[in-house]
Amino acid sequence: MSPAHPENWPVLVVKGGVDDELLRDFTALAAAAEESDGNPPLSEQTFVTLRAGESGTHSLLSLALYAPDEESDPATAQDLAGFAVVVEEADGTGVLELAVHPSYRNQGVADRLVATLKASRGFDGLKAWSHGNHEAAADLAAKYGYAPIRELWKMRLTASDAELPDAALPDNVSLRAFIPGQDEEAWLAANKAAFSHHPEQGNMTRQDLAARMAEDWFDPAGFLLAVDPSGRILGFHWTKVHPGHGGHPAIGEVYVVGVTPEAQGMGLGKALTVAGIKYLQDKGLHAVVLYTDADNTPAVSLYRRLGFTRWDADVMYGPKNGG
């Protein structure tokens, strides 16, 4: 490893989609960071966007900081010390996520990336995630005038904690699995209606859905739809299974639960939540996790009644002045 300070290391700035080699480098570093920290440094949405490339709703800005070998030309250095990715929305706002390889921490790598980002893009409309609420991320955010604006709780239910209540579906509502090639448009409409208050989820496009369906983890059997006698989708529970790694067992996730406005107030949300958890438990998974905003008191209360406890938190940072 070079003793040179990171301020002298080359930073590759890529606007638009990344090539396969850079994506492999990002994926390998992210895996090393997750193994060290216990949390993935990138959200699933960011990885989906990186793999799928830019779309009509998202554009990309990526920065990669390479640590030059003492014997090599810095322009061709191979050691990726850290990277940053900004997913830009059509309205000009963006979300930053950043990762530093465990071998290169406490050397100013993150600061170099953020300084380069400030010079190349600026901070207008920019927010940032820290997955796992790391102290180093909080210090870096404060240095650049950012403060916490949102806290996303990761809650967990283990098999030993699980005493799920009976939660029958409402009358004239049945449950079935998502059928690829048939249900995409109907589900997108139901999702948009269910999350009209949550544009991050509600604005999902056919391309976004296709990208998720192309992921290795996608299994239509765990994508549960609640339908009325006419077949109309009233709600859904999309589950996910994270494969085991590094000696850790596979774990299930309450990926997203939604209920359309006309079906709310019937207990369908609770019934769908319980049905999805039972589906995951029947697959032999030792634990189930979910994400919810810390200030969503009704959701937190429901999940606690089901046996979930707070496990970790992700923190979003924004400018202190609200800019």
UniProtKB/Swiss-Prot annotation:
Q: Which InterPro entries match?
A: Acyl_CoA_acyltransferase, GNAT_dom, MshD_Acetyltransferase, Mycothiol_AcTrfase
Q: What residues does acetyl-CoA 2 bind to? A: V257, G258, V259, Q264, G265, M266, G267, L268, G269, K270
Q: Which residues form the N-acetyltransferase domain?
A: 173-323
Catalytic function, reaction form? 1D-myo-inositol 2-(L-cysteinylamino)-2-deoxy-alpha-D-glucopyranoside + acetyl-CoA = mycothiol + CoA + H(+)
Q: Name one Pfam family in it.
A: Acetyltransf_1
What PROSITE patterns has UniProt attached to this entry? GNAT (PS51186)
- Which top EC class applies here? transferase
Q: Which Gene3D superfamilies match?
A: 3.40.630.30
Binding of 1D-myo-inositol 2-(L-cysteinylamino)-2-deoxy-alpha-D-glucopyranoside occurs at E44, E200, K240, E253, Y291
- What EC designation does it have? 2.3.1.189
Coiled-coil positions are: none
Quick one: a GO biological-process term for this protein?
A: mycothiol biosynthetic process
Keyword Repeat (UniProt): yes
Binding residues annotated for acetyl-CoA 1, in chain numbering? L98, A99, V100
- Spell out the subunit comment: Monomer.
**UniProt name for this protein:** Mycothiol acetyltransferase
